[in-house]
């Protein structure tokens, strides 16, 4: 249409110019010839431009047909200069680097599988009966048969898998994480023939970040677990030593439990978190002696490492502050926090006609530091102290005891008393080339809390924790020193890495009561050697 308009305009302009020339007697013949020549040149130039425009239109139509492949569409056919900027932007969005060669995307969500295959060899100088996880509070004494037997295991059950799902939706950054291994509750004959180790879920949580706020829900490492960085739930940001032991290390408090956490990131360096976590009132296996008259009633109300019938009053509440230095200078992480826990029970008092319920609140404080003195060397430390928090110390000591209360000459009720306990872990870590070294010392302490059991028909009997004639499973302290070495044999960002993970540890445990002629301590030496393939 525009081509027709331009042609008509040129014809009319030419005719008008000729008419004016023939009617003007004063115009010179040379001027008329010059004007005609100029008009012819202009028409020729416009015809060239029209031909070029037609070629450009045909080229654009061909490209449009190739892109749409015959799909019906509405297109803007206006001729304009092509700009490469939008195409570049699309390429950058769709071709941004992936977290891992194994990552894949569905829409705007990225899925990243990971994990490792572990071939683990374990030697212990006494027969604990454990596999990848050491029962720190149950090391056999030298006056038992197990204390004179060594044990050796070869297993792949410490192998692990995980899946990270991440995406950004508007202003919301979402991360979902799933992690499992094969350290579940195995059958008693698991090592006989086929070694069918039980799969278990370690972690499964969803994390939402929006602005300065972060919310976490699911099963995760609790806030009492030491961090290396901020208050992050990511396993790589936690201080769990370099240990190969599935029970981590004596001195490291932790849980992996159902929880909800809110974190305020006040700045790039400072974070404050508040968490509610699944509770469990715990007395340990053969550690606490209940009053004789109430033993049958109290048994199902406290976890003795063998049941899940505990009543629990309300969730444990934990808060923690974390400060991290900037990118310049030494790498420093500092944290401090507090926790609150509760215990409760109900009994039918001796000589009473109605039930009696009792509860008590306990808690504690914690703190830690992770100091990078240089690029390849750091010092680490963490401690916790409180009452009613023994469960957090790898289930090695009790939370509370129940003692009798005389209400009359032959009538009794009962009440709660918390057990004081503490943990400490100190260490140094060094990285040189493909080698990582860790040196650690850790300990747990559990305060005695016993009473004269006036409900027992046998005079002079004591109950509670750590009293006279208490079992040697009532531990006063546990200690462990370790040297740990991880060597990377081969690593490729596309194919993963092959590592050798080693650990050499010495442990001791000391009970509160030592019978005449019995050993004062139980000792254990153990070594781990693992060949591990890590997915990229």
Pin down the residues of each PLM region.
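Transmembrane beta-barrel strands of outer-membrane/channel proteins
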Residues: 115-123, 178-182, 217-221, 274-278, ...
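Outer membrane beta-barrel
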Residues: 99-288, 313-328, 370-376, 380-391
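Outer-membrane beta-barrel "beta-signal"
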Residues: 522-536
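Detector for outer-membrane/organellar transmembrane beta-barrel domains
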Residues: 328-483
């Amino acid at each position: 249409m525009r081509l027709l308009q331009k042609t008509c305009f040129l014809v009319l302009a030419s005719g008008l110019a000729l008419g004016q020339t023939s009617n003007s007697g004063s115009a010179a013949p040379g001027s008329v010839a010059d004007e005609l020549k100029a008009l012819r040149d202009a028409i020729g130039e416009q015809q060239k431009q029209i031909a070029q425009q037609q070629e450009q239109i045909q080229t654009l139509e061909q490209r449009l047909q190739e892109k749409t492949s015959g799909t019906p569409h509405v297109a803007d056919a206006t001729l304009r200069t092509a700009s490469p900027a939008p195409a570049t932007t699309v390429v950058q969005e769709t071709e941004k680097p992936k977290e891992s060669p194994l990552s894949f995307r569905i829409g705007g969500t990225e899925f990243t599988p990971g994990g490792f295959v572990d071939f683990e060899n374990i030697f212990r100088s006494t027969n604990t009966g454990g596999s990848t996880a050491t029962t720190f509070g149950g090391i056999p004494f030298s006056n038992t048969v197990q204390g004179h037997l060594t044990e050796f295991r070869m297993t792949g059950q410490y192998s692990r898998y995980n899946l990270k799902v991440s995406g950004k939706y508007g202003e919301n950054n979402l991360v979902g994480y799933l992690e499992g291994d094969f350290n579940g509750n195995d059958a008693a004959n698991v090592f006989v023939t086929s070694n069918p180790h039980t799969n278990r879920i370690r972690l499964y949580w969803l994390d939402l970040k929006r602005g300065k706020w972060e919310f976490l829900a699911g099963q995760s490492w609790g806030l009492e677990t030491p961090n290396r960085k901020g208050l992050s739930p990511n396993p790589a940001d936690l201080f769990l030593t370099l240990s190969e032991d599935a029970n981590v290390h004596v001195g490291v408090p932790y849980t992996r439990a159902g929880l909800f956490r809110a974190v305020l990131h006040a700045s790039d360096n400072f974070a404050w978190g508040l968490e509610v976590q699944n509770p469990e009132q715990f007395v340990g296996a053969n550690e606490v002696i209940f009053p004789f008259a109430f033993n049958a009633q109290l048994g199902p109300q406290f976890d003795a490492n063998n049941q899940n019938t505990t009543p629990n009053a309300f969730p444990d509440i934990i808060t923690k502050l974390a400060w991290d230095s900037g990118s310049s200078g030494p790498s420093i992480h500092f944290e401090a926090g507090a926790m609150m826990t509760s215990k409760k029970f109900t009994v039918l008092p001796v000589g009473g006609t109605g039930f009696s319920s009792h509860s008590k609140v306990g808690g504690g404080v914690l703190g830690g530091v992770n100091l990078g003195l240089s690029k390849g060397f750091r010092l680490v430390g963490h401690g916790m102290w409180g009452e009613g928090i023994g469960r957090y110390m790898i289930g090695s000591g009790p939370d509370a005891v129940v003692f009798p209360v005389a209400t009359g000459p032959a009538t009794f009720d009962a009440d709660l008393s918390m057990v004081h306990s503490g943990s400490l872990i100190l260490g140094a870590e060094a990285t040189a080339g493909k080698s990582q070294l860790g040196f650690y010392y850790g300990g747990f302490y559990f305060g005695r809390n016993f009473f004269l059991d006036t409900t027992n028909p046998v005079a002079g009997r004591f109950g509670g924790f750590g009293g006279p004639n208490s079992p040697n499973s009532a531990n006063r302290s546990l200690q462990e020193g370790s040297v740990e070495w991880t060597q990377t044999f081969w690593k490729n960002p596309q194919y993963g890495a092959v590592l050798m993970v080693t650990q050499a540890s010495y442990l001791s445990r000391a009970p509160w009561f030592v019978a005449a002629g019995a050993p004062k301590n139980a000792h254990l030496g153990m070594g781990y050697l693992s060949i591990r393939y890590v997915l990229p």
